[in-house]
Amino acid sequence: MTDYIGNYKNRPRRVVFYGRVSTEHEEQLSALGNQMEWYTDLALRNPNWTVVAQYIDEGITGTQMKKRPSFMRMIEHAKEHRFDLIVTRELSRFARNTVDALNATRELKQYGVEVYFVNDGIWTMDGDGEVRLT
């Protein structure tokens, strides 16, 4: 994992975090708390980030994006240009299949919103970002 994002990625950003757990079991909810703490630590290591929101879907499967209320609200807020970067720990938290991931990131790109999948090392505005999603 890269702690501090360099080069053009280092410019000031309005950042949101997206986290999801698929069940409401105690261990999953604890994992969600760990995800949020991890995001906070990451933000502290990137001083040009201003965290404006966190979107969390609890106890919801990732198979259908339209059934994830926080995810859909995040997309609506992207349309309103409330932020310019979504940070999520890994691709599997964002989408369960390649088609959904590509469709969502392409839509977000139209609004000027990038997605950074930290553990996967994928930044969607990179030249190879879309290819690496597949």
Task: List each language-model region with its residue ranges.
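Short, structured surface patches at the beginning of a domain
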Residues: M1-T134
